[in-house]
UniProtKB/Swiss-Prot annotation:
Alphabetical list of Pfam families matching this protein: Sod_Fe_C, Sod_Fe_N
Protein name: Superoxide dismutase [Mn]
Cross-referenced NCBIfam families: PRK10925.1
Source organism (scientific name): Haemophilus ducreyi (strain 35000HP / ATCC 700724)
Subunit structure: Homodimer.
Amino acids binding Mn(2+): H27, H82, D168, H172
Lineage, uppermost ranks: Bacteria, Pseudomonadati, Pseudomonadota, Gammaproteobacteria, Pasteurellales
Length: 213
């Protein structure tokens, strides 16, 4: 088995004017593809690791030979993070139901949640990700550096939790369209959050059947 670049499930221009076609195409077909290629090359002599769920491998990187561990953390992390990111994007969905209720419960209001998420994304120094996670039954906003993920746990990533959705704040995710205006890119994100997918992940995890991918 080898890792494969996932289909987006929508056209590169489907998220315009918020996320532009050129950025989406380069981001998916070049940047994400590179993470896939590098992960396959790193693990080609370890078929037993390629057979594992990528998320499960990232949760316990001690399974990876020490000399390859950092490279797998970065590249397989990039593959898994981007796969979740693409699934979490769609126009025309609405925050509602159990996820909305939980956001209000844990943050006080939807507006307070959005402000906290925007702050986490804007203040992540350099490259990284902002996340909405479920941790011990409670929603939280966290951020990670580089291609780290909350699924790696606190010892590796500094944070933990089950990802509900994420935002890529690497410059390659927005620079062609937004240049150095990261806050504008972050605010545009709310127009393309796939709340249906976020709700599905939240409800499945609440029911005890969510899979870390």
């Amino acid at each position: 088995m080898t890792y494969q670049l996932p289909e987006l499930g929508y056209a590169y221009d489907a998220l315009e004017p918020y996320f532009d076609k050129e950025t989406m195409e380069i981001h998916h077909s070049k940047h994400h593809q590179a993470y896939v290629n590098n992960s396959n090359a790193l693990l080609e002599k370890h078929p037993e690791l390629l057979e594992k769920c990528p998320g499960a491998l990232l949760k316990d990187l001690t399974q990876v030979p020490a000399e390859k561990r950092t490279a797998v953390r970065n590249n397989l992390g990039g593959h898994v993070n981007h796969t979740l990111f693409w699934k979490g994007l769609k126009t025309g969905t609405t925050l509602q139901g159990a996820l909305k209720d939980a956001i209000i419960r844990d943050f006080g209001s939807v507006e307070a949640f959005q402000a906290e998420f925007e702050q986490a994304a804007a203040t992540r120094f350099g490259s990284g990700w902002a996340w909405l996670v479920l941790e011990e039954g409670k929603l939280a906003v966290v951020s990670t550096a580089n291609q780290d993920s909350p699924i790696m746990g606190k010892d590796v990533a500094g944070v933990s939790g089950y990802p509900i959705f994420t935002l890529d704040v690497w410059e390659h995710a927005y620079y062609l369209h937004y240049q150095n205006r990261r806050p504008d890119y972050i605010k545009a994100f709310w127009n393309v959050v796939n709340w249906d997918e976020a709700s599905r992940r939240f409800e499945e995890k609440q029911a005890g059947c969510g899979c870390t991918k």
